[in-house]
């Protein structure tokens, strides 16, 4: 299980990304619009740089919803490979059966 501080840090990042998503998108649109004056675009870049680092979506890391494990994450189920195996063996995931050949 991941440290609680790491799980909370990731939750905080998710909140910040959601909070600043609209503002960040607006500033990016202004900064990348070549029809606008260069000075206005530069000011938008400066404002974008002043936003909190953790408000950027690229800083998010997928974590298992049950354990907080950051590696071997299955996006579709939002769990790690270990929990996928445990839940699958326990019959908690509909349609998943243990393979045999």
From Swiss-Prot:
GO biological process: translation
Family indicated by similarity: Belongs to the universal ribosomal protein uS14 family.
Lineage: Bacteria, Pseudomonadati, Pseudomonadota, Alphaproteobacteria, Rhodobacterales
SUPFAM superfamilies found in the cross-reference section: Glucocorticoid receptor-like (DNA-binding domain)
InterPro entries: Ribosomal_uS14, Ribosomal_uS14_bac/plastid, Ribosomal_uS14_CS
Known role: Binds 16S rRNA, required for the assembly of 30S particles and may also be responsible for determining the conformation of the 16S rRNA at the A site.
GO cellular component: cytoplasm; small ribosomal subunit
Gene (UniProt): rpsN
UniProt KW keywords: Ribonucleoprotein, Ribosomal protein, RNA-binding, rRNA-binding
Designated name of the protein: Small ribosomal subunit protein uS14
Disulfide partners: none
Keyword Ribonucleoprotein recorded: yes
Top-rank taxon, per record: Bacteria
Pfam families: Ribosomal_S14
Subunit structure and binding partners: Part of the 30S ribosomal subunit. Contacts proteins S3 and S10.
């Amino acid at each position: 299980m991941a440290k609680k501080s790491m799980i909370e840090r990731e939750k905080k990042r998710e909140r910040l990304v959601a909070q600043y998503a609209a503002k960040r998108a607006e500033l990016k649109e202004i900064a990348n619009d070549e029809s606008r004056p260069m000075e206005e675009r530069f000011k938008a870049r400066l404002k974008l740089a002043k936003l909190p680092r953790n408000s950027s979506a690229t800083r998010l890391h997928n974590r298992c919803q049950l354990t907080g494990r950051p590696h071997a994450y299955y996006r579709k189920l939002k769990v790690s490979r270990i929990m996928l195996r445990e839940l699958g063996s326990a019959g908690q995931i509909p349609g998943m059966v243990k393979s045999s050949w």
